[in-house]
């Protein structure tokens, strides 16, 4: 979904050191353009033969999505993700707010803040951030699936169904795919109906 990326310990050390730098200390550069390798990985995940293989490919996608525009932005992103993983949702929101204020054109800032909103069951705020993330990065599969889950949380089932279908076209191995299985809450209407 919108979520996780393991960062080695040395990145966390950099994050702690860089956290003392105010976000307004310099202007955020443009986010790196990883569209070419991401498109290649999307092709690979569509051809994956197992869930394990697909997960490995998805993890490589995360490395690109979570590649912030510079070291300062990376430190803020990593710090927020660490706080989120420790269930410090308010601290994570503060970090992602800071990241978005500093790098308003960086999609992952919105995606990560959306995840925190989602975990807090604030689906409307999650949806707003996911829509912005997708404006900036239209084929961000994790944001697409997060959007589907947020719409589902708002009981907007038809929109959730469409959002999940779009994400599954890019990665048919998403963990959320089971929601669209026959009998699932986001299954197409009539899927799984038994004729008598």
Language-model segment annotations:
Residues 78, 112, 146, 180-181:
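Canonical tetratricopeptide repeat
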Residues 70-136:
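Alpha-helical adaptor scaffolds
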Residues 85, 119, 153-154, 186-188:
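Register position in tetratricopeptide repeats
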Residues 22-78:
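N-terminal leader/linker segments that initiate helical-solenoid repeat arrays
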Residues 46-47, 152-176:
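TPR/TPR-like (Sel1-like) alpha-helical repeat modules
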């Amino acid at each position: 979904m919108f979520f996780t990326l393991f960062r080695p310990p040395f990145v966390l050390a950099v994050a702690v050191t860089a956290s003392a730098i105010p976000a307004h200390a310099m202007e955020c550069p443009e986010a790196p353009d990883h569209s070419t390798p991401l498109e290649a990985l999307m092709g690979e995940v569509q051809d994956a033969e197992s869930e394990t293989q697909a997960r490995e490919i998805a993890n490589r996608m995360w490395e690109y999505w979570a590649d912030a525009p510079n070291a300062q932005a990376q430190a803020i992103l990593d710090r927020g993700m660490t706080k989120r993983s420790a269930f410090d949702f308010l601290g994570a929101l503060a970090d992602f707010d800071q990241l978005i204020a500093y790098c308003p054109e960086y999609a992952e800032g919105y995606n990560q803040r959306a995840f925190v909103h989602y975990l807090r069951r604030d689906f409307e705020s999650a949806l707003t951030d996911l829509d912005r993330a997708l404006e900036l990065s239209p084929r961000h599969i994790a944001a697409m699936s997060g959007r589907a889950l947020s719409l589902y949380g708002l009981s907007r089932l038809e929109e959730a169904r469409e959002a999940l279908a779009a994400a599954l076209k890019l990665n048919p191995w998403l963990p959320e795919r089971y929601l669209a299985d026959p009998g699932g809450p986001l299954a197409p209407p009539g899927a799984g109906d038994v004729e008598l």
